[in-house]
Swiss-Prot record:
InterPro entries: ThiC, ThiC/Bza_core_dom, ThiC/BzaA/B. Signal peptide: none annotated. [4Fe-4S] cluster binds at residues 423, 426, 431. One of its GO terms (molecular function) is carbon-carbon lyase activity. The lineage of its organism: Bacteria, Bacillati, Cyanobacteriota, Cyanophyceae, Synechococcales. Zn(2+) binds at residues 279, 343. Pathway: Cofactor biosynthesis; thiamine diphosphate biosynthesis. This is Phosphomethylpyrimidine synthase. It comes from Prochlorococcus marinus (strain MIT 9312). Keywords: 4Fe-4S, Iron, Iron-sulfur, Lyase, Metal-binding, S-adenosyl-L-methionine, Thiamine biosynthesis, Zinc. Its cofactor is [4Fe-4S] cluster. GO terms for cellular component: cytosol.
Length: 456
């Protein structure tokens, strides 16, 4: 679909959506997104130009169906997949991708760290993906030197970053906000640094006693990104890994640097979103969202969770979906899903499904709370189907039709019960909705009550 769109842009110094928008040009991607979001294309262009909305769309990802992330559009959900040294293979990761797309992932991140050829798994995922693909290049940078921090050079980081761009990665998590002077602020935390990318860079800085190379070479990375229209996802290396560490000096010091880097990326006309926590008590979520908007000049916010309790291993998708719904309500643009395996192991296909559905609920709830146009239409349609006992319509409109039908059919499997005016909870005699009170009866009752009141 995008080949004809991209061809005229080839060879230009800057092919980013924000560059076109700032020059008053509505790209095919902007027009496509406008139709998906039911918004004017002119508004999409204005929001992209302002930096409040991004369209992650690498020019080498030709089978991509463009989408947007930003406060003007629907709240989006990202799903993480990826192989590890201990589990998974390329075919399994491609199947996870397909499952994630099936259940509504708006973007997918390949977080592979080993166990497979990282280039091959990434190519396979991009080739199969209609949604934007994100990566964390420092993982492969470390893998390329067989885990030896002392052998990892600044140029190694940039080489891997450009390789990901060439392969069609739409956005990359760049942990450029972690500075060497931030590291002492981690003292006193319970869980220290929980970001894998942040941990790698912290070790690099401590070993070489030098500033973060992703910070010192940030302008070079911008020059790479604008050739491919790769989007920055500025990583939060010091995100809190537990409630105790939330909103501390370390996190907020890095956030200030992320704001500086956001504006530097915009100076190069490169798209950017900013990543956020993590583990945050419910009463601090609004503060975290507002603080990011203030420090980062309203660049789209992309949060992991946040989890609102630390005692839910095995159920962290529930704990975090609570925080995610609140974050979305307060203005977060994209929610990174958490699966039931979070903190416990590598998620399988079923974990991907469970995590995604939990987060689609959270994002949808946020859109309803923010009064986005049409956000509640599907809910109202399902409610009408429920009141009319249209079981098949209820299944069809649900976020997970297969699960809804499975649960209904566990107790009433025969096809005749798809027309029944009850389920197994109340049975035929006690369901309040199958004894429908007509509007006419209610009007008559209202008239009688008014007569009684007027005669008193």
């Amino acid at each position: 679909m995008r080949s004809s769109w991209i061809k005229p842009r080839l060879g230009k110094d800057n092919v980013t959506q924000i560059n076109f928008a700032r020059n008053g040009y509505i790209t095919e991607e902007m027009d496509f997104v406008a139709k998906k979001e039911n918004l004017p294309a002119s508004l999409i262009m204005e929001e992209v130009a302002r930096g409040r909305l991004i369209i992650p769309a690498n020019i080498n990802h030709l089978n991509l169906e463009p989408m947007s992330i930003g406060i003007a559009s629907r709240c989006k959900v990202n799903a993480n997949i990826g192989a590890s040294p201990n589990a998974s293979d390329i075919n399994e990761e491609v199947e996870k991708l397909k499952l994630a797309v099936k259940y509504g992932a708006d973007t997918v991140m390949d977080l592979s760290t080993g166990g497979v050829n990282l280039d091959e798994v990434r190519k396979a995922i991009i080739h199969e993906s209609p949604v934007p693909i994100g990566t964390v290049p420092v993982y492969q940078a470390l893998e390329s030197v067989h885990g030896s921090i002392d052998r990892l050079t600044e140029d190694d980081f940039l080489h891997i970053i450009e390789k990901h761009c060439q392969q069609g990665v739409d956005y990359q998590t760049i942990h450029a906000g972690l500075l060497i002077e931030h590291l002492p602020k981690v003292k006193g935390r319970i869980t220290g640094i929980v970001s894998r990318g942040g941990g790698i860079l912290a070790q690099w800085m401590l070993h070489h006693f030098k500033q973060n190379p992703l910070y010192t070479r940030f302008d070079d990375i911008c020059e790479i990104f604008k050739k491919y229209d790769c989007t920055f996802s500025l990583g939060d290396s010091l995100r809190p890994g537990c409630l105790h560490d939330a909103s501390d000096d370390a996190q907020l010091a890095e956030l200030k640097t992320l704001g500086e880097l956001t504006r530097r990326a915009w100076e190069h006309n490169v798209q950017v979103m900013v990543e956020g926590p993590g583990h945050v008590p419910m009463d601090q979520i609004e503060f975290n969202v507002r603080k990011q908007m203030e420090e980062c000049s309203e660049a789209p916010f992309y949060v992991l969770g946040p989890l609102v309790t630390d005692i839910s291993p095995g159920y962290d998708h529930i704990s975090s979906a609570i925080g995610a719904a609140m974050a979305g309500w307060y203005g977060t643009s994209m929610l990174c899903y958490v699966t039931p395996k979070e903190h416990l192991g590598l998620p399988n296909a079923e974990d991907v499904r469970e995590g995604l559905i939990a987060y689609k609920i959270a994002a949808h709830a946020a859109d309803i709370a923010r009064h986005r146009a049409g956000a509640r239409d599907r809910d109202d349609e399902l409610s009408h189907a429920r009141y009319n006992f249209d079981w098949n319509k209820q299944f069809e409109l649900s976020l997970d039709p297969e699960r809804a039908k499975q649960y209904h059919d566990e107790t009433l499997p025969e096809e005749i019960f798809k027309k029944a005016e009850f389920c197994s909870m109340c049975g035929p005699k006690h369901c309040p909705m199958n004894s429908k009170i007509s509007d006419e009866s209610l009007d008559q009752l209202k008239d009688k009550l008014e007569e009684c009141n007027s005669s008193v």
